[in-house]
């Protein structure tokens, strides 16, 4: 099952979905969401959150999954909030260890002077060859599968 979810995330990205969408939608059924719901709720996080090149969208998808698994549902649940923050921090550190950074611009090797644009690039063979995004999606999905396996889920 682990490999199927990882492959599904990569497949979704190669179909043209955003990095964040690909990670979340690969696990949608596990959390009771339809594919469409998962794609919509994670849509804004691609490209480093709204294509602003901040936190990697694949990592954002990973953190959304952490919220679905451990997020608190009571406003006064400080213990639950702390547990969720701890998990997100653990996942972020693992993502950084494997990929060298957490920030989209750093992962892409972009300079700070490049303008932020909202229009995505065409998904061509050249696009996939120059960007590490497929690897980020794969690693985020793998990290989540490993977490679930450790939890016996």
Where is each model-derived feature located?
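RNase III-family endoribonuclease catalytic core
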Residues: 53, 75-80, 95-96
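Glycine/serine-rich anion-binding loops at beta->alpha junctions
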Residues: 17, 45-64
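Polybasic, low-complexity association/targeting segments
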Residues: 1-15
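Acidic-glycine-rich active-site phosphate/pyrophosphate-binding loop
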Residues: 26-44, 113-118
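C-terminal binding/interaction regions
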Residues: 84-153
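Structural signal for hydrophobic packing residues in well-ordered secondary-structure cores
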Residues: 13-16, 27, 31, 49, ...
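Phosphate-handling active-site elements
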Residues: 30-40, 66-87
């Amino acid at each position: 099952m682990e490999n199927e979810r990882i492959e599904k995330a990569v497949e979704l990205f190669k179909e043209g979905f955003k990095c964040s969408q690909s990670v979340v939608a690969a696990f949608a059924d596990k959390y009771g969401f339809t594919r469409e719901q998962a794609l919509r709720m994670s849509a804004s996080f691609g490209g480093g959150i709204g294509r602003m090149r901040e936190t990697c969208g694949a990592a954002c998808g990973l953190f959304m999954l952490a919220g679905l698994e451990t997020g608190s549902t009571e406003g006064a649940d400080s213990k639950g909030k702390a547990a969720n923050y701890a998990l997100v921090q653990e996942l972020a550190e693992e993502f950084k260890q494997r990929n060298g950074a957490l920030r989209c611009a750093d992962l892409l090797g972009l300079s700070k002077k490049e303008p932020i644009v909202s229009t995505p690039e065409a998904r061509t063979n050249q696009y996939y060859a120059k960007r590490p995004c497929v690897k980020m999606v794969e690693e985020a999905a793998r990290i989540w599968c490993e977490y679930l396996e450790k939890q016996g889920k």
